[in-house]
Amino acid sequence: MGHKVNPIGMRLQVNRTWDSRWYADTKDYGDLLLEDIKIRDYIKKGWWEHVAKRDKRPAGDAGISKIIIERPHKKCRVTIHSARPGVIIGKKGADIEGLRKKLAEITDSELHLNIVEIRKPELDARLVAESIAQQLERRVSFRRAMKRAVQNAMRMGSLGIRVNVAGRLGGAEIARTEWYREGRVPLHTLRADIDYAHAEAETAYGIIGIKTWIFKGEIMEHDPSAHDRRQQELQESGGASRPRRDR
């Protein structure tokens, strides 16, 4: 079963938690959920595409990994995790102020906007998948892009990584799937800290799907917030700790 389901969804309330962290009554739930979708879509598409077009940057240049939305009493706290926070903030904070004003128009609550830097993008499944997608759109060989991503992740301290690409690879008439793995990726082990993401590359031959799994170690405690704390520790330290082997 571990190979069939989403690894993050399978570990919710074990060592992972949701990106939307709030509670609402039945009558307000639908409105708040739609508000979350609008906020995420605007940050990833509307606002960033405008900034990228203005500054002539690639669409995924901001390196946004995830957007966490929390709703304390009559407030809305939006936290953007990005590998390039300076690109989002802009010169003298001009871009982030414009983003804050636009998001305040979407939500009726008092808005707080935070930017968190991802210091090791090579260990973030979302950024790795989007990086491979951008390379495929630039006509880089899919094998070279896959191997480069795997080597960078292992060099930065990952205990295992797997990358899948599927579609008309290399312009072939018949679509196929190829994958590359190094190290361990124990999908059946619930205590395993596995990051997963999916991205799409729009090429001249059609869409190519990319999936990445990154194994960062094991979390022994039963705590939904354990993954977030571990992420912060890995960013501050030198990467994932490798298990000892007795010889």
UniProtKB/Swiss-Prot annotation:
Q: Basic and acidic residues composition bias: which ranges?
A: 224-233
Which CDD domains does the UniProt record give?
Answer: KH-II_30S_S3
Q: Does the keyword Acyltransferase apply?
A: no
Residues annotated as domain KH type-2: 51-119
Entry annotated with the keyword Transferase:
no
Q: Where is this region: Disordered?
A: 224-247
Instruction: Enumerate the UniProt keywords alphabetically.
Output: Ribonucleoprotein, Ribosomal protein, RNA-binding, rRNA-binding
Q: What does this protein do?
A: Binds the lower part of the 30S subunit head. Binds mRNA in the 70S ribosome, positioning it for translation.
Family label? Belongs to the universal ribosomal protein uS3 family.
> Which PANTHER family does the record cross-reference, listed alphabetically?
30S/40S RIBOSOMAL PROTEIN S3, SMALL RIBOSOMAL SUBUNIT PROTEIN US3C
Name of the protein: Small ribosomal subunit protein uS3
Q: Which source organism?
A: Jannaschia sp. (strain CCS1)
